[in-house]
């Protein structure tokens, strides 16, 4: 998707397992999966594909999209997901996050996707009145250890990440921030690394060949 728009989609392959095989061959040790159908509708359509990936490669997988209640979380954990990302529900039902963290600890992460500093929900189709910084601090109070922060205006555009807001979240919350959206070059990765990001999610830049995953891993992955 470009900037989260479901009417601007590029499909890079019809077989997620084959795609992940290439990532693993390049040295990937953690896979980020988003159920875009689930994010939009609140129903996990791609459970079987996620399970096939986990069963095939036996490496940690984090996944989000359509996680709206405890049953959704339990289903993901039961098929072997290492980290479940709660997005929309963190705004609409923050008590779910609090309850989930009590049960599953650091297996729970929160996805904060923002436009102009305000959190977007429901597959990025609704803009809330909650700021990214405020939600991040609230989630930290609930015991969340990891937040995936996406600047929607950057996502899929290959124009570089939002370093300023990512740094603000790191500095003001003190929790692990994984940067997402717009990362395209080694210079982008150096900037994200320099501000103290816990990690980074790269998608389109790999699919389109702007970044070589093996080179990225060799240079930046912490042992």
Give, region by region, the residue ranges found by the protein language model.
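Glycine-rich phosphate-binding active-site loops on the catalytic face of alpha/beta enzymes
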Residues: 38, 67, 78-96, 151-153, ...
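Glycine-rich, proline-tolerant flexible connector loops at the mouths of alpha/beta enzymes
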Residues: 30-48, 88, 148-159
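Hydrophobic faces of well-ordered beta-strands that scaffold small-molecule active sites
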Residues: 31-33, 61-65, 84-86, 108-112, ...
């Amino acid at each position: 998707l470009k900037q989260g728009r479901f009417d601007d989609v590029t499909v890079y392959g019809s077989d997620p397992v084959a795609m992940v095989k290439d990532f693993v061959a390049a040295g990937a040790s953690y896979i980020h999966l988003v159920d875009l159908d689930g994010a939009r509708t609140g129903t996990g359509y791609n459970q079987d594909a996620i399970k096939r990936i986990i069963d095939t490669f036996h490496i940690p997988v984090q996944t989000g999209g359509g996680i709206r209640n405890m049953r959704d979380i339990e289903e993901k954990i039961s098929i072997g997901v290492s980290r479940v990302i709660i997005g929309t529900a963190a705004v609409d039902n923050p008590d779910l996050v609090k309850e989930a963290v009590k049960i599953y600890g650091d297996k729970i992460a929160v996805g904060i996707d923002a436009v102009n500093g305000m959190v977007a929900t429901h597959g990025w189709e609704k803009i809330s009145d909650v700021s990214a910084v405020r939600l991040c601090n609230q989630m930290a109070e609930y015991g969340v250890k990891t937040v995936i922060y996406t600047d929607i205006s950057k996502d899929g555009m290959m124009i570089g990440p939002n370093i300023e807001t990512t740094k603000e979240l790191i500095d003001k919350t003190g929790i692990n921030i994984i940067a997402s959206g717009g990362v395209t070059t080694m210079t982008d990765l150096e900037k994200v690394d320099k501000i103290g990001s816990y990690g980074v999610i790269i998608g389109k830049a790999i699919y389109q060949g702007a970044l070589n995953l093996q080179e990225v891993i060799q240079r930046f992955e912490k042992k």
